[in-house]
């Protein structure tokens, strides 16, 4: 039996509860690095992506640092997506929320060895970028259409679909109902060797 004296009790306020004062501490942006016994995570100050050993929990290296890039410069970032081979990452910035799980953002391609940072696209913000398995292509959605960026061709950008239109046709993204009910925000992927893209196409033209 545990007894707590009234003198030691503290009053709880609505502000304490809603401010996150009693929220559990979490670690953001953890991703295993494929083919290794290490993982990557965003630093506590939100300025870096560091790698750590699963065995020891100790930091091994800094993979990305906003203050140490060649080419483009950014002040901060909201997330990252490692390439399957672990040599590059997509850096997510200027995030704009849409629904519960969906958002658009400005992405950059970062090469870890050279510290080179370059825009994924010179167009408007992108959604749900995904790497090909060889890490040499990135597909993304903009304005309900799918685009492809080829890294070996000087980041050449190709528009894959052209029929996407708000409230009519959606390529590569779930509609709001599917996003909400099934809990996903991307509806496209590469095949194993990166020669094809498979996606869902939603036609809402007859939806009232």
Where in the sequence are the language-model features?
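Beta-propeller folds
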Residues: 8-208
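Hydrophobic h-region of N-terminal signal peptides that target proteins for export
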Residues: 1-7
